[in-house]
Amino acid sequence: MEQDDRLLNAMFEMCNHKNPLNDGQREWHIADIPGLLREERYDELDERYNQALTESFTSREAEKRYFFAWNQMDNPFYDMDTLVEAGPQGLALIKNWQRARPRSTHAWLAEAQYWNHRAWLYRSYGWARETTRAMWICAAACNERMVIAALNAIDCEPRQWMAAALISTNSKVFGQPEWLVEFLVGADV
């Protein structure tokens, strides 16, 4: 047990050195998504995130900024945190954004990240051997919703690499929905 604690502490220390602090020189935060959604400032959200996505193609720092804004794992700079933690109320705000801007890649990416978070909550962030059959079933259902939202995000903006990254990462853990596998192998779906 003591050895496990030392190993975990060493891993946390290593991760902390990889992720620089969010100081004045390095701002990972792009926008207060929940606040702007509550105020229905959809154009501002889309403008900020579209600009960040565009910048991510030409700058490693901008790529990190965009990645950390959307990546929840062990990340204090995650723009979506309070929105996904709000549960159904957070999802309702995202759905309002989608209704107002159905071609917004980031409105769909927000939903993908919402379902991604839910899938991992059901799966549990601990060891997989602690995950019950019921938890796996719920996680798979959330993952399927995540895949659908991520594909919509990519349909709106084919260069939407964060949605592709979510699908790729989760396929290793949850697999892919059967209908997607059939589609990818050329079956009529």
Question: For each of these PLM feature ranges, what is it?
Answer:
Residues 1-29:
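Non-catalytic protein-protein interaction scaffold segments in large eukaryotic complex-forming proteins
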Residues 109:
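Membrane-embedded glycan transfer/ligation machinery
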Residues 17, 24-39, 43-103, 113-189:
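Short coil/linker segments at helix-helix boundaries
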